[in-house]
Amino acid sequence: MDPYKHRPSSAFNSPFWTTNSGAPVWNNNSSLTVGPRGQYLLEDYHLVEKLANFDRERIPERVVHARGASAKGFFEVTHDISHLTCADFLRAPGVQTPVIVRFSTVIHERGSPETLRDPRGFAVKFYTREGNFDLVGNNFPVFFIRDGMKFPDMVHALKPNPKSHIQENWRILDFFSHHPESLHMFTFLFDDLGVPQDYRHMEGSGVNTYTLINKAGKAHYVKFHWKPTCGVKCLLEDEAIKVGGANHSHATQDLYDSIAAGNYPEWKLFIQTIDPDHEDKFDFDPLDVTKTWPEDILPLQPVGRLVLNKNIDNFFAENEQLAFCPAIVVPGIYYSDDKLLQTRIFSYSDTQRHRLGPNYLQLPANAPKCAHHNNHHEGFMNFMHRDEEINYFPSRYDPVRHAEMFPIPPAVCTGRREKCIIEKENNFKQPGERYRSWAADRQERFICRWVDALSDPRVTHEIRSIWISYWSQADKSVGQKLASLLNVRPSI
């Protein structure tokens, strides 16, 4: 039996209709009433159960990444990186690990069109022999902010107006006018890449900086990158309107239909690494999530391939109840002091416990496929069968022991307790370089999108001036074009 299908279930066992408790139901068409036109009777347990279950079908929507689609497959190592990490699932070329992947839009609600200009989530759960590894990323390699303290406010600004429930540019531009570090992210979001054609033709990135550790304990900072073998394709404005108007679930359907037809999506995994001893050699902070690592200095290194060859069996069980958390790592892969990553480590598991309950890791899509043992038990919706008598540690009656120690990055923590910004902000260099790397027509489309956003009637002269000033510092020509088209002088 498919491990995702847990008994008892009327969908797989009984040839006739039953209640949740297994009692036979001889009539699932009519309610129990006093005569053919009389009152309903509360003793109609099947009716009460049926309605009560229906009333509770919806669970809290994800606060971000609500709109998503999932698929299953495998990850296969193609290149040896055992000199960089002792992670078991990366131990040698040819090793395969089962995975489940969830793609998503970020800001908009469950059921919203998949053609909106929005970052896309790209989250991969590896079911390894040493536990699960969640690589929770996006399609863009950078992010809007570098400190998780700002995350709730950022999401509130990007979400619809709480009064009208309409997403509005003036709110977005007001918030980010206080955060010039967001410019680099906007060179992706307002670029042609802002609306992927579908999930199959989309890159992925781990976004945050992690740490690889080898058997000797040597650590390297690492960035993860997914490259689709079928290439990157995007939708321009008129194309997005046409596609979204015809099918608001076009990306979900494309993913499902492609896998069903045997046209399996595939991505190559690459990494970039930095020796922590060399992190001060750059004009940016390698742990700053608003920066990319230059590929001419830190080249992409091939690692493996991701193939999605099986559609999910049930959307609710394997998409809505599927839960990711950047804190879930395996020996050989660890966190870094990336400020945004440090806050994500707490926030993701916290929101899953709110959304799915304290035992969300027991759900089939989230549970490890390897043996596991601890004393975390009971609580709401605990359905793991346990018959042991020892639920404490240590005990002379239970032979369970500590696992063998694995290397983690050595760290000496010194410094004052303070709330501060990083030293190397350098907010404007990389956005300017990225803009200048584009062809003229691509630059023009980028400018037009900014003019459209800044033309919101509720965007004040002050906010327009600030944005023109920011873009002037990134690339003088961008500021000049925006100032001319908007008839605004930059405020520096």
UniProtKB/Swiss-Prot annotation:
Active-site residues from the entry: H65, N138
Molecular function per GO: catalase activity; heme binding; metal ion binding
Xref: SMART domains: Catalase
Keyword set, alphabetical order: Heme, Hydrogen peroxide, Iron, Metal-binding, Oxidoreductase, Peroxidase, Peroxisome
InterPro entries on file: Catalase, Catalase_AS, Catalase_clade1/3, Catalase_core, Catalase_haem_BS, Catalase_immune_responsive, Catalase_sf
Catalytic reaction(s) noted: 2 H2O2 = O2 + 2 H2O
Enzyme class: oxidoreductase
Biological process per Gene Ontology, one example term: hydrogen peroxide catabolic process
Binding site for heme: Y348
Localization per Swiss-Prot or TrEMBL: Peroxisome
TM stretches of this protein: none
Keyword Heme: yes
Chaperone found in the keyword field: no
Names of required cofactors: heme
GO CC, any one term: cytoplasm
Main location: other
Enzyme Commission numbers on file: 1.11.1.6
Subunit-level organization: Homotetramer.
Function: Occurs in almost all aerobically respiring organisms and serves to protect cells from the toxic effects of hydrogen peroxide.
Miscellaneous comment in the UniProt entry for this protein: There are at least five isozymes of catalase in cotton.
Protein name (Swiss-Prot/TrEMBL): Catalase isozyme 1
Gene name per UniProt: CAT1
